[in-house]
């Protein structure tokens, strides 16, 4: 049972939670592909998306100083290059415009989402210590700084820095240790059942699942202490209003 009165600290996921209100970033980017009328199928896009993620995980492309707009420009460029290499797209001026337009649309999407959440995050910060635990590319500090989010978190646990990635429960153990509180008095808030909720539960934390359009199908039995479909519902859960 989730009793907010027992909560003394909060661990937040970042990507897919704070910056997209539960929607997997693959689908945010796919929506931008469609808006820019990129002539590829959803399956071709998924191939390119996976390729880019794997490439970024194994190559030093994202620099520590890159904000989210720069990150997106680099990521979309890799996707477009893959689609050209595979013969799904024909290289030309239009393909250059795709990278620019899609990255701008996605960055604007994130900025608008976050701007609506900042008052809520400020209210939470006034009541609770908060730690961020994120699988990211080594530039999450620059991303948070650009979005004016850095001051909300007492500590940031980033996979590329600590050498542990979700769904390994150890990365959440680091978050619990950073808060210095009993795990049962900490709630983890994230959008991924596999990468956030399960490892948080293994640490003994309470969980709030921001359930949106994920990458694949969720296990039908998947659950958390609280399930929400909109970030702003946290205001009600934490009795902030």
Which functions belong to the PLM regions below?
Residues 3-118:
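N-terminal helical cap/lid subdomain that shapes the substrate entry/recognition surface
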Residues 126-127:
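Structured helix-beta-strand junction loops
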Residues 1-10, 43, 90-93, 118, ...:
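Asp-based, Mg2+/Mn2+-dependent phosphohydrolase catalytic module
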């Amino acid at each position: 049972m989730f009793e907010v009165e027992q909560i003394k600290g909060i661990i937040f996921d970042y990507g897919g939670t704070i910056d997209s209100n539960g929607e997997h970033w693959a689908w945010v980017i796919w929506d931008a592909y469609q808006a820019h009328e990129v002539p590829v199928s959803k399956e071709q896009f998924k191939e390119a998306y996976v390729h880019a993620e794997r490439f970024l995980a194994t190559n030093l492309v994202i620099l520590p100083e890159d904000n989210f707009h720069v990150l997106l420009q680099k990521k979309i460029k890799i996707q477009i290059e893959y689609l050209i290499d595979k013969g799904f797209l024909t290289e030309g001026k239009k393909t250059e415009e795709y990278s620019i337009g899609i990255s701008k649309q996605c960055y604007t999407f994130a900025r608008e989402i976050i701007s609506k959440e900042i008052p809520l995050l400020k209210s939470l910060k006034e009541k609770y210590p908060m730690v961020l635990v994120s699988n990211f590319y080594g530039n999450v500090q620059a991303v948070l700084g650009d979005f004016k989010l850095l001051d909300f978190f007492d500590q940031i646990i980033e996979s590329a820095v600590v050498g542990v990635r979700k769904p390994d429960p150890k990365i959440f153990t680091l978050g619990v240790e950073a808060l210095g509180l009993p795990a049962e008095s900490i709630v983890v808030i994230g959008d991924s059942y596999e990468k956030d909720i399960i490892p948080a539960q293994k640490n003994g934390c309470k969980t709030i699942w921001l359930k949106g359009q994920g990458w694949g199908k969720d296990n039908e039995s998947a659950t958390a202490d609280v399930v929400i479909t909109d970030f702003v519902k946290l205001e009600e859960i934490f009795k902030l209003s």
